[in-house]
Amino acid sequence: MMKGVKIEILLLLSVFFLACGNRNEENSGKDLTVMFATTTGLVGDGYNEPILKALMESVSAQPGITVHLLKPDNLSEARSQFNDWLAGADERKALILCGPEFEPLVDGVNLKTGRIMLLDSDKTYGGGISTALLKRYGGAWLAGAIMKDFELVLLKGLDGDRIIDEISQGIEDGYSDNGGAGFQKCVLSTGYEGLNMADELYSILWEQEVVKLFYSYEGLIVPVCGSSRLGAFNFSWRYYATIGIGDDCSPYTDILPFSLVLDLGGIVREYVSEWVQNSSWPAHADYGMSTGHVYISFNGRFFQNFASNNESWPFSLDAWTALENQYKDKALEKEAGYAY
C-alpha cells in the first residue's frame, strides 16, 4: 500500500511539472516558492504531503507559474534559503513557509516587495507578511468524544511540539470529558525522530500488550506522529483498527473508521488562488472547524466491507454520525475557547 501511495505522488509530480512548463501570458513571470517543514518528510506525514498535493492541483489549474519547492534539513539551511529568496524578491514573487518553526525567519523582516505567507502561526507581523493559523483542538476534541466507547492507544510522536501537543490534548480531553475510560498514551521519542520512525512503530505495536486489545474489537490506534503513522497503518492491515490524523487516510488502509482531516492543503490552495488573481492576503486569518478546514471524514469502505461483515464491531456508520452530530456544537465551543 505504501508503494501505491508513492506512485501516486510521482504521478502528481509529473502533472505538476508539466503544468509548470505550460506557460501562458497572464501568469508568465509569477514565481512561487514553498518551503516545507524540516521535521518530517514529504510523503505520508499528514502535514507536508497534503500541502504538496494542494499546491500541485493549484498550479496545474494555473499554468505559467514558476514553482520552487524547498525542503531544508534544518533551520540553519532554511535561513540561508530564506535570505536568498529575500535578496531576489520582487512584486511577482511569493513565498509560503509551511510551519511555525519558520517564525524566527520572519521576525524583524519588513518586506518591501513580493509577499510571504507563514502557515500555522498566531502572530501578526505586517510589512508584507501574512500568517494563517489552523485551530486543531476542537476537531481533536470531537474525535476523542466520538471514540469514548473504545479503548484508545494514542501514539504521540514527541512531547513539546505545539501542534502535536494540541491534537493529542484535544483527543484525550474529548475522550475523558465524555466518559472514556480506557486511554493509553505512548510517546515515541524525545525528539523529532518520533515523526519519522514507521518501521520502529510497527515493532512497538507488535511487541507491546496493546495488540491484545484488537482481538476483541475494543481498541483503536490513534497515531499523532507524522510519517511514523505509516507503521500503524501497516499494523492495522494485519490486526485492527486505526484512526487517520491529518488528512484522509483511507487510501492507506481499509481498516480505518474515520480520519480527522486538518485541511492545510485547502488553506494553501486559497492563498495561491488569491495571489494568482492579484488579491491581497490578510495580515492574519484563523481556520478550523468553523471554516470547514477541520472535520471528520468517515471511511465508507470500512463500514461497507468490514464493519457490516463483523458482528463484533459495535458501531454502525449511522451511530458514529449521530455521535458526531451530538458533540459538534460543543467541539466548536472548545475550538473557540482554547488558548492557542
Locate each region found by the language model:
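An alpha-beta-alpha
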Residues: 55, 139-188, 283-310
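Short beta-strand elements at the ligand-binding edges of bilobed clamshell
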Residues: 124-148, 156-159, 253-265
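Hinge/cleft segment of the Venus flytrap/periplasmic-binding protein
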Residues: 270-340
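Extracytoplasmic "Venus flytrap"
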Residues: 33-54, 58, 68-75, 100
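Short, well-structured alpha-helical segments in soluble
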Residues: 76-93, 197-217
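C-terminal motif of bacterial Sec signal peptides marking the signal peptidase cleavage site
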Residues: 18-19
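Periplasmic-binding protein-like
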Residues: 36-37, 91-100, 119, 154, ...
